[in-house]
Amino acid sequence: MTERRSVLFRGATVVYSYYGRRGAPAVVLIPGFLETRAAFVPLAEQWASRYRVVLVDVLGHGESGCTGYVHTIEDQADAVLAVLRAERIRFFKVAGHSMGGYIALALMERVPDRLRGVMLLNTHPFADSEERRALRRRAMEIAKKEKSSYLHAAIPALVAPENADRLREELRVMAEAARTMPVQGILAAQEGMMLRPDRSGLLRTVQSFPVVVVAGVDDPVIPLEVTKAYWNFPAITERRALTGGHLSFLEAGGSELGW
């Protein structure tokens, strides 16, 4: 069973999909920057046989609205918590891809007693470097002037070059979904990522739940060496390096992901 649902959060509508059966253990799946629920349907359907999966469009992305000109990672985490309140879900696992991983870490900081597992997909816990902030500012200027050109360059770059042809349809779907996003949503997310703090301390101590890290061997956005800088921290219980780029969970050809 799949249902489209929504909840009001700070005056904006947050849209999400609900998979599986009520009463099963809950998993929240959070897409990343420029991503929508559309790209994660195969993963949600894979998990729906064991879990009830809540697949969320983050603020300013997909069908979810904007609450302001800056969406901090903490704002995004609060929006996810609003969805969980609406579904009356107290205990859950969370899987976040890229920016969604930053949101998952914020949830790990905010509600650790409610978590039953964390999966960090092609992401990291560190704050932006000055170099990274400069790159974001340049990207924001391009997005302001010509959103279509910005997306045309950004979406295909998510996968390893050798996978681009095989995943052409998936990338087309992602690009079409991204074109519907308001520029405000793109800029607000970039601003929020620049403001996020270092949360690596959360992973330096053992947690009461499993923490799984999934990386792409050829990830152009978050290189494998960045992931390796933290994946031996005490909280990490499992490490997986998949073939592919930033969408490694998709590029690896249906590799089973789970806790």
PLM regions with names:
Residues 63, 105, 123-131, 162, ...:
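A short beta-to-alpha transition loop/helix N-cap that caps and shapes the active-site region
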Residues 128-134, 145-206:
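Conserved alpha/beta-hydrolase catalytic His-Asp/Glu region
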